[in-house]
Amino acid sequence: MVKVRPFAAVRPPKQYVEEVAARPYDVLNSEEAKAEAGEKSLLHITKPEIDFDPMIDEHSQPAYDKAVENFKEWQAKGWLVQDDKPYYYVYAQTMDGRTQYGLVMCAHTDDYASGAIKKHELTRKDKEDDRMIHVRIQNANIEPVFFSYPDNEEVNAIVARYVAGEPEYNFVAEDGFGHHFWVITEQADIDRITEIFADIPAFYVADGHHRTAAAARVGAELREQNPNHTGDEEYNYFMTVAFPDSQLKIIDYNRVVKDLNGLTEDQLLAALAEDFDVVEEGTEIYKPGKLHEFSMYLGGKWYSLVAKEGRYDDNDPIGVLDVTILSNLVLDKILGITDLRTSKRIDFVGGIRGLGELSRRVDNGEMKVAFALYPVSMKQLVDIADSGNIMPPKTTWFEPKLRSGLAIHKLA
């Protein structure tokens, strides 16, 4: 069971929302952020190093100080304004004609500690520490985390009533994705949402494992520092956008490798044939069409690789994943890449970039071979999280990403 509550969001007035809203901090580098950021962009708060010329280290104290200064300035100028009372909010995203409807709310840090907020990825302490600094210095969750939850018809009905009305925000970003936002204003609806979620068994972290872990750690810190702690303080909660799991779609997360580990192309193909049925598909992009099928781009040609029976364990929720099959039978066994987290010989490409990005990086000589995977399903993610298992690195890619700046949660 999960504990949620509404909050008084700090958010842009309607006339500024398109200028303030920005892509998340971790999907663009400093140079891209500097080029993309307009005067009012939230990137000045999430990527404050862009305000220095020349740019400075994003992890330096002057950058952190600038982030705090900018957050205060945005509020002083009226580009961000706090709502007068706590609300829940509906945030909908449209991509390729498909819309998903999330609830912007606060989740409780205790649920992360207890396991009611379920994760499917390991986190790195250095990344957690960096996110903790941002939460501490701002005393706020500037960006939300992305959760899923089991479908609930009553929640869907409440959301449907609000989205039938005029949205508070409604715009299409430069990437072509639509962003729509409503405020749930009726107290009876707010109370009912809180009650319903108290009976929902779990949240699942879709995207934002490091932000979730950092929020939980900051909450624990502030709890220890407060001799009058009651458990009701705002720092016990952190901001999420939670979507029904049936509405979410995971897209492919692909791999490109810099070398063939000393093999020729023919030797690689021969080694692959031990564990896969290998079929040359030609020069046109070839996309895998089912589980346990991979496409490979090598030497200007696409190949289909279908894992042979008996090469993986259908009863192992991790071993049966295509990312595991590829890692075990190809990346480790043939190409000698044993640790995806630390190897400099491999890179990862989100499916949103298209398979043409894979062939481009091989054709230009940057990489030697590319592998495209069939995407993981939400059911696989939920089953693995429920079993307490952890997916291999770079398994899931969710799109569209949450737009930052539509709502901010202050911890006090």
Features from the language model and the residues they span:
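Surface-exposed, charge/polar-rich loops and edge strands
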Residues: 1-412
